[in-house]
Design a protein with these regions (language model features):
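Short, solvent-exposed beta-strand edge segments and adjacent coil->beta transition regions
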Residues: 54-56, 102, 154
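A non-catalytic structural micro-motif
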Residues: 85-94, 109-140, 153-164
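A generic structural micro-feature
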Residues: 147-151
């Protein structure tokens, strides 16, 4: 009988330990996806801007003209930026790898400026933004193919940390 009681206590302890282990695994505070999802759901956060609004617009080859898709994204950016006016931000202009470094720096600058001008036309204060061109120096995709080049022809709106 004594052995049965010890066995029963051991089983209760094992069941309790297993339940605690399952509960601990269900909520991992070090899970980067959990932190990102929590941040993404916070209205007005930088993650909210990237995930729900979109932080970049794309351009045709050798062009700084905003197409209809870019204007639609910038309209959403303008609405968000006007609502959360405490953010200052930088517009980065980028180009694909084709062309000289100097040409692509100038093209990236025109893309950033076109993006800036459009946001200003939608009521966003020009005092909150600055532009910079990286030309072809910071590609997001590296390969000798149109699929990579099209991803690199972009302007990215980057919110400054901590707001304005």
């Amino acid at each position: 009988m004594v052995n049965f009681i010890r066995l029963f206590r051991g089983m209760r302890f094992a069941a309790l330990a297993a339940a605690m282990l399952v509960a601990a695994c269900a909520n991992n505070p070090n899970d980067p996806n959990a932190a990102m999802n929590a941040s993404a759901s916070t209205p007005g956060s930088a993650q909210d801007f990237v995930v729900n609004v979109g932080d970049r617009v794309f351009f045709d080859s050798d062009s700084s003209e905003l197409n209809s898709q870019a204007r639609a994204t910038l309209d959403k950016q303008a609405t968000w930026l006007n609502q959360y006016s405490h953010y200052a931000f930088t517009i980065e202009g980028h180009a694909d790898e084709r062309g000289t470094r100097e040409y692509n720096i100038a093209l990236g600058a025109r893309r950033a400026q076109a993006t800036r001008d459009y946001l200003i036309s939608r009521g966003v204060s020009g005092q909150r933004m600055r532009t910079i061109s990286y030309g072809k120096e910071r590609p997001v995709a590296v390969c000798n193919d149109i699929s990579c080049w099209s991803q690199n022809r972009r302007a990215v709106t980057v919110l400054n940390a901590g707001g304005a």
